[in-house]
C-alpha cells in the first residue's frame, strides 16, 4: 500500500512535493505512463497494511493535500 499525494506532468513539481513530504516517511517519485502521457506520482510507503497507510494519509491531508489517497500496486 502507498499514499499517493499527487500525480504531475512536470517532474520538478513532483520532486518539490516529495521533498516536503519526507517529514511523513519515505516519499518518492514514481514515473507512470497513462494513455501515452508521462506522469510523476508522489507516493509515500510502502506500507504492509492499509491501516498503516491510513495513518499517514490523515497526516498528509492535515498538511493540506486533500486529494491524497491510499493506493495498492
Please place each PLM-identified region on the residue numbering.
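Extracytoplasmic
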Residues: 9-73
Amino acid at each position: 500500500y502507498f499514499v499517493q499525494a499527487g500525480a504531475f506532468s512536470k517532474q520538478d513539481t513532483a520532486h518539490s512535493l516529495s521533498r516536503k513530504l519526507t517529514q511523513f516517511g519515505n516519499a518518492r517519485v514514481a514515473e507512470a505512463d497513462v494513455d501515452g502521457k508521462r506522469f510523476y506520482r508522489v507516493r509515500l510507503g510502502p506500507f504492509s497494511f492499509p491501516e498503516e497507510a491510513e495513518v499517514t494519509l490523515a497526516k498528509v491531508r492535515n498538511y493540506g493535500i486533500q486529494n491524497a489517497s491510499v493506493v495498492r500496486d
